[in-house]
Amino acid sequence: MVTWPHSVDDIGGFLITWLPIIFFGIIIWLLLRTMSLVPKVKPAMVDRDTTDPVGWGDVAGADEAKEELKEVVEFLRDRKKFERLGARVPKGVLLYGPPGTGKTLLAKAAANESGANFYSSSASAFVEMFAGLGAARIRKLFAEARKNAPAIIFIDELDAIGSARSGGAHNREHDQTLNQLLVEMDGFGGADEVVIMGASNRLQDLDPALLRPGRFDRQVNVAPPDLIGRDEILRVHTRSKPLGADVDIGVLARRTAGLTGADLANIANEAAIFAARNDQQYIRQVDFEGAMERVLTGLQKRRVVTEKEKRILAYHEAGHALVAYLMGDVMPVQKVTIVGRGDALGLAYYLPVEDRYLHTKEELLDVMKVALAGRAAEEIVFGRVTNGAASDLEKVTEIARAMVFEFGMSDIAPSRTMRADNYALSEETKRMRDSAQAQLTDHAYEEALRLISKHRVSLDRLAGGLLERETIDREEFLAIMGDLPRESRSAETVGTVRALDAEAL
């Protein structure tokens, strides 16, 4: 017979004594382990010896922003030049604009040109689950920058800690971090040679306290580059690449309207990859064109479509291209294809003649006609429409909405806006507003139907070419169009001064 040497009372006493100690020991161990996992490598000085130096020559397409930062650089180089005239140099510079426009590159160039120590960090590095850690890291960063002045502190994605305070208990850590940043910026004295730079894609979300004078004194808009800027950026990113004799940077710049510097750098890199894939010695124009199509519309996809669908697709894209040609220089056709890319089964590419910032009502109507021409071609040729025009309808709806709601291009309110969030509008006015929007889209579709019917022969010829070759470039397209007369010249009238008859006054 086996006997247990300890009584039940002894075991119970042991458990009562030691279980709470073991439990709390495990809790403390888990807490210490969790805190040890918190990243300790936080904002630190960038070592120029281990990074590629960036100067003003590497920054293109942002001349206005560059000039603003050059003044900051001049202050860090020769502060007495400003002090003897009583000038107060901005404490902070906020760079804002869409992603990929070169905000970080500008900050790096400014630091390198000034010779100042450069501290770079993302704002998300200051946000932690433990209260007070973000504020402590802000204090440490600014203390180190002051110790190593002259210095530039760059905080990317500033909206992560700089968004407007809500006052909620769950945002306490965020608010403490932001408050500490505000305190540190206020703490810069006249002897400080530290400039803080921030970058954000969402200026409207930042706390107003950050934007007041004395903190981020200068707010610099870093917008997507214009035609000249895109030309300069492409030259910067291709200067170390062997280019073929047929490469025309000017044409590439015209074809990339609306793209950012990051997009253009990606295009230059993709073109080099295309050339290397084909074991070429030089990068050709066709490599850049393929790179642009890949960046803009995605990978080429050879979907298996039926002959019936292929025919519908050919007439749809031919309708877009035909009406675009008839509209003159509003949307000059560069290429038409029924080879799918990304989510699109077919595409028509347009080459803007120049960068435009002002558009007339007639031009916007012409753009709507082009967008609806694919659907119009389907209806006229096949007697029915497909879901292939979904994105076209969305684009047309956005244009018509803007014309009525924002641009005052309707008969019901030609001298004021009628935004969707304007709750002061009566129900009758809202109904009239929606009716005016529908009238614009309906009129554009009726015009597209008329143009397609009138030029059916040219439509058939263009669709036949697409069915035969799948892709038609600009030269082939113009040859198919022949001497077809244009139906609209709205773009040619922009900026033309209308003479008034003195007798009519």
Language-model regions: role of each:
Residues 312-314, 321-505:
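Soluble catalytic regions of large protease machineries
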Residues 85-98, 255, 309-310, 392, ...:
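Glycine/charge-rich, flexible interdomain linkers and switch-proximal surface loops
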